[in-house]
Each structure stands twice: as C-alpha cells, then as structure tokens.
Regions:
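Acidic, metal/ion-coordinating pockets
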Residues: 1-189
C-alpha cells in the first residue's frame, strides 16, 4: 500500500500432473472442495482470463513437470504459453522436487520449480521467490530467487559459499531460458 493505493492480486492454484481422482487429491467440483486439475487447460485459461479482468496482477501456482528432472519439459512451455497469453503475470511451479530454471514466456516470469520447501526428511537445495510490487504502478517491480536448504524437514536461508553455489546452479539453469540472476538473486529478462 503506497499512500492508500491498493493492488488486487489474484492467485490460482492448479495441478497438471494428477489426471485422475484419488482419495488424497480429489478433483474440485461445483459443490465439493478438491484440487483444480488442468490436464485439459481450457478451463484454466478461462479462470486466468476472469482473474485478469478482476485483478491488477495474476499469479498461477502450478503442479507440473517431471519428478527429479532439473530440466523443464516441453509440456511446461506449452502450458506456460497458454497461461501467459490468457493473462497471467507470474507462474510459480512445483512437483519435480528439484530446482528448475526461472524463465520468461511471452515476457512474463516462470519459476518452473522451486524444489522442495517443506516436504521430506532428506537434504536438498530449495528456494523462495521474493516478488516486489508497486501498488501505485499496479505491477511487479522485481523478482528475486532466495537460495535455501531443506534438511530434516526444516528450511534455512543460505549464506556465503553455499548461497553462491545454489545461485550459480540457478544462474546456469535460468541462463538457457533467457533469464539472468545477479549476485543477490534478482532476476532480469
């Protein structure tokens, strides 16, 4: 809030991975809660368009990709293209359980996978996204990858050589997608 200037942010959460109902992740219906499946993305695109009409900024959080693969897959790019064309300003992905690139699709940032933030008892690199907004301008003014380590179901911010190691990994992954990360993790595309 900058001088009582407000910004409306829409958040849509969906899964492209789970195609079928199971007891843990039942699909949402008009009368029952559950997950929003987008194996057929047409409904997702409509929801993004509706959100775009009612919000200043639209974020789509999506469960997608291939587990344990650090490289994004072609289906993620196809879906990201449709989501951004429908009006999303930022896509944040998960499911691979490892870090994947931060890229740009149609000029909009896509964090393909931030790894595991709080999931298992093993040790793995992970990260946060810091999104900076200007409510006055009604837009995102910065995007930063913050390196973390998940160990024993606890997450810690990384510093020093470990922070630089994870930032280098993300720079290498993201560079092939046209995104650069500075020494503090701020992205540019």
């Amino acid at each position: 809030d900058e001088g009582n200037t407000k910004m409306r942010i829409a958040l849509i959460s969906t899964t492209q991975v789970e195609q079928f109902d199971n007891p843990d992740t039942r699909g949402a219906t008009d009368t029952l809660p559950g997950v929003f499946r987008c194996w057929d993305p047409s409904r997702l695109y409509e929801e993004v368009k509706t959100a775009r009409e009612n919000a200043d900024f639209v974020i789509v959080c999506i469960h997608w990709g291939v587990e344990s693969e650090m490289q994004k897959e072609y289906r993620q790019d196809i879906l990201a293209d449709g989501i951004t064309k429908a009006g999303a300003d930022l896509i944040v992905g998960g499911h691979p359980h490892v870090l994947q690139a931060i890229g740009a699709v149609n000029g909009k940032p896509v964090a393909y996978s931030l790894g595991n933030f709080y999931f298992t008892s093993y040790t793995t690199d992970t990260g946060l996204l810091q999104v900076q907004f200007s409510a006055k301008e009604k837009k995102m003014t910065g995007l930063r990858f913050v390196p973390c380590l998940q160990s024993g179901t606890a997450v810690q911010l990384l510093e020093g050589a470990e922070k630089e190691r994870v930032l280098k990994e993300m720079r290498d992954l993201s560079g092939s997608c046209g995104v650069s990360l500075d020494e503090d993790g701020w992205a540019s595309w």
